[in-house]
C-alpha cells in the first residue's frame, strides 16, 4: 500500500508532461500567427476601406474571436496545467536527500552541544510523549531521531559520511506513474495497464491518423475538394471565353453544400430580376434562356446570383440568411479561383502546354470579384471603364466621364496631382475629401515591370531537346513606396492579399507558369539565394562569383523585385514568339506583358558527340586489328623462318653427303 501511494504521486507529473508536449508548441504557433496578423496591417487608408470595418474589430467581434472553441480549449488546458504545477510543487517528493543538519535546524559543522540542544528542543515539539499526532510521531522517528543518531553515533556518522544515510547504503525503487485506485486493484492492475497501453499508445493514434487521412484525402493542398478540382479539369476548354468562366467557377463542390431553403425562393426571384442583365442571357431567346437558368441545381443558382450581387455592389439588400450564404460564397472564392487557374494552365497536350485563354478569363473574374466590378464593364468598348470603377467614389457615369477626358486609366495615373485634382473637381464635381481618397488608392496601385530570358545553361544557343531555363525578374513599384500591401477592396468582406501570376505563353499555349507574392520578403530572399546558388554551382562558378550573384539578387528582392525561374523542354526547331504575362488577381488595369523571341536550333550537340565517339571506336578497332594481325604474322614468319632453316639444313646435309662420296 505504501509503495503504491509513493508511486501514485508521480501520476500528476505524468499527466502534466503529456499535456505540455502538445500544448506548449500549439500555443506558441497560435501566438506567432496572431502576432503576424497584427504585423500585416499595411492596408488602404481610404474612407471606404475604413467604413467597410474588416480592418477594425469591434469589442463583440474581438470577444467572439477570442472565445472560439480552440482558444477556450487552450485556456482551459493551461488552467489545468497551472493547477498540476502547483500541486506537484507542494506535494512531498518521492525521494529526498537526507540532511541531518537541516532536519535539526543547524548549520553544517555544528558542535555536539548545539546538536544535543537542538534535539532536545525538537523532542519537546515532536516526541510521541509530548505530541500524540501520528504525523509528528512519524516525523520524529524517521527524521529527527535518525538525524540525531547520524550526528552523534560513530557508526551512524560513518555510514552517513560514506552513503549519505545513517542506515548505510540505500536502494532505490522504480514506480509507475498511475493513479492509486489502479495500483490498489488486486490481480487486475495488469489488465488495466494493458488496456491503457493499447488504447492510448496504439488505438488512439490510429483513430486520429485515420480521421486525418480520411479528411485530407478529400482535399488538395490548397484546401479545395478533389471533387471540385476534377470538375474544373473536365469542364475547362481551350477556347473558353471569359464570359463563360463563371459557369465553371460556380460548379465547385464547396458551393453545392450551400443550404437551399424554401423561404429564399422569393428573394432569389428578386435577385434574378435585379441582375438579369449581367447573366449573359441571349436576348433573342430570353424565355428559353431563363427556363434553362432555373433548371440548374438550386445551390448553383444561388451561388451565381450572390456573386452577381457582389459584382454589382448590391449585397446590402440581402436578407440575413442570404448574407450568411453570401459570405460563405466569397470566403471560398479566392482559393477556388486559384485552383481554377491551375487547372487552366496545367499541362494537357504532349508538349506539356496549358491553355492561356481560360487562364486570362479566370484572372478577369478574380479581379472583378475582389473589386466588385461587373463583368460587363470588362467587355470591349470605346471606353475601358473597369479600372476606374475600382477607385473610391466612382460609379459608371463618373467613370465614363473621366474616360472620355483621359482616354485610358494609365494616362489618368500619369497626370500630375494638380491636374488630376482639377479634373475630378471640375468634370465630375467630387469634393476635396473624395479626391484625397482617390489619391490614396492610386498610390496603392502597383506598376509592374518584366525582364525575362530563356536560355540553355552553359550553352551558346538553344537546341531542340535542350532543358531551357526561364528566368524572369518581376519588379513592383508603388507611388507610396510600399512593396507588399493589402489591396484596396472595400466591397470584399475578407482580408485578401494580392497575388501575381507569371505566364509564358505562345498563342493559346502556356509553356510556364508560377505564382508570385510580394508580402513575404524574407521568403523571397531565401528562395532567390537558393535558386541562384543551385544554378551557378553546376556550371563551375567560383565561390566569389556565386556570392556576388546572390548578393545582387538579394538587393533586387529588397528593392521590390521577385525572381521567377523554371525549366522546360525545348520544342522542335523553329522561331517562337512568346509573350510573358504578369497578371494580378486583385487589381484591374495593372497587368503587364512583354514579348520574348526564342530561336530553337537543330540538334547538333549529340550528333557531334556521337561522331566523335564513333571515330574513337574506329581507331580502337584499327589498333586492335593491327594487334591481332601482328600476333599471327609473327607466328607465320616464325614458321617460314623454321622451314627455311630446315631446307637449308637438308641442302647442307646433301652437299656434305656428296662430298663424302
Swiss-Prot record:
Swiss-Prot/TrEMBL keywords: Chaperone, Endoplasmic reticulum, Glycoprotein, Membrane, Protein transport, Transmembrane, Transmembrane helix, Transport
Pfam families (alphabetical): DnaJ, Sec63
Membrane topology category: Multi-pass membrane protein
S-S pairs: none
Cytoplasmic side: 30-65, 212-661
Domain SEC63: 206-597
Coiled-coil zones: none
GO process terms (BP): protein transport
Compartments reported by the entry: Endoplasmic reticulum membrane
Ranges of biased composition (kind: Acidic residues): 609-637
Knockout consequences: No visible phenotype under normal growth conditions.
Glycosylation sites: 90
Transmembrane segment boundaries: 9-29, 66-86, 191-211
GO CC list: cytosol; endoplasmic reticulum; endoplasmic reticulum membrane
Lumenal side: 1-8, 87-190
Start and end residues of each stretch annotated as Disordered: 608-661
Superkingdom of origin organism: Eukaryota
Matches recorded under CDD domains: DnaJ
Known tissue expression: Expressed in leaves, flower buds and flowers.
Subunit structure: Interacts with OEP61/TPR7.
PANTHER family linked: DNAJ PROTEIN ERDJ2B, SEC63 DOMAIN-CONTAINING
Task performed by this protein: Required for integral membrane and secreted preprotein translocation across the endoplasmic reticulum membrane.
Protein name as catalogued: DnaJ protein ERDJ2B
Native source species: Arabidopsis thaliana (Mouse-ear cress)
